[in-house]
Amino acid sequence: MTLPASRLSDDDLRARMKQFHWWHSMALRPGVTTFGGKPELLLAQEEQAFLGPFDLTGRSVIDIGAWNGFFSFAAKRRGAGRVLATDSYTWNHSAFRGREAFELARDELGLDVEGLELDPTEIDEKVGLFDVVLFIGVFYHLYDPIDALQRLRGITRQLLLVETHQDLMENPNPGMVFYPGDILNHDATNWWGPNPALMLHLLLQLGFTRVFYRDHPTLGRARGTYAAFTPEVEAGLIQQLGPPWLDLDVPGAVEALLARG
Amino acid sequence: MSEAELLQAVEAHRWLQSLRLRPNLVTSGVVPEARLVAEESALLDPLNLTGAHVLEVGAANGFFSLAARRRGAARVVATDHLAWTLPGADAQSATQWAAHALDLEVETLALDPRGLSADFGSFHVVLATAFFEQLFNPIQALRGLRSVTNRVLVLETLQNELADVRPMMTAQSRIMPFGGADGSWISGWAPNPPLMLQLLRDLGFNRVLYRNHPTLGAARGIYAALLPEAPDGLLAGFEAPWINMTSPPAG
């Protein structure tokens, strides 16, 4: 379902866009694109990498840390049923004004995507169950990401998709590095860098039964994406999980990943 | 309680710690008495517990809670979670029998430290041993401990990645000797000292002291974290091998 298109003129739309700090660069109209920190091309590559393997048709999706909503919109365009975009930090940030930016983009794109202010540390069963949970670029921004993963398990019906900064890549043992202050990229909101062995460990401990992994499409091993499936996953959700996706929950998979470099 | 009843109770329980209940009666615990005695000295000798309120988290069979009571603590609450609540676990009952046999008043409560909050109360000394290695989420549990500490947190834990200066922790699952007949798989963590320092400082402890385990060396570490409200005089008890990780004190 699409919503009625915005009645703003191109100039008025550009003026509204300038009121916000954008992270996602999105074409809202032909010739009118938000000027976000992440370029359109990179986002297109990430969308294909993160969502391409899955058939979202009719499935419910929640996007945790949606910011300007790019991946929520992408899920909707890919046929998802109910899509709920959530955020807290960037939506309440006085400079980012992420929720207003999200709503402007949503209204302009005419996509039926709900918005809910929700901090990952407060997620519980009251938010409901979703076939697909998107947790893109959030894990390492949380002081207690273990708690957040545990909460997300409780709302995942089929698939939790986690994309994160990584560290400790030379170590085959599960572990994560802590970043005090702003030592990671001069950003005081960066807290942890897990390695693939740890992500596998945490996801299996939380009751996900299958875990697949792939490097970031342009940044390589510095960032990883994990597709963690519950025992209730429907076969139809997965369209294609071939290379570069790696089945991580089989003996020797982490070691093979590290050896591959 | 007759000696026969005591013997029957000792034999009826699976003991995690070796407790001397009579001059010639020591429970056959997984952890030997000599190690526990050395740990008691390392953990408690620096502190004057006279009149103190003490909370122990992860008490197992209460060896250190009983020791705190012997050392003059006014109130001691011994708690444990997995070792007291997993199906088949009988360690809380064993603790109660031990306290009864030794005629030491120790309260016992099955408790998940992740759920601790200020509503639970306030303790001069909070003691937690074998901490990170038995917790899926030690970050949350540390917050719980902080919420009930009003002077000193003493924490003992498995450690890893000691050669790395970056703060970090590693995860592992291992069999612990409680729960079912063959024990239980427990998922936990092993931090390194730089991480412990950061986490404790982030919780508001402004003086953090450290020493290696008295018998196992750096494989296990002991931390004493003091809140700003704790008087400097408390530091006097922390002689070598203790080192002050926050010297000069953090702001």
Q: Where do the PLM segments sit?
A:
Chain B
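S-adenosyl-L-methionine-dependent methyltransferase catalytic module, highlighting the catalytic core
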Residues: 114-116, 123, 127-128, 136-251
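Hydrophobic adenine-recognition pocket in adenosine-nucleotide-binding enzymes
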Residues: 131
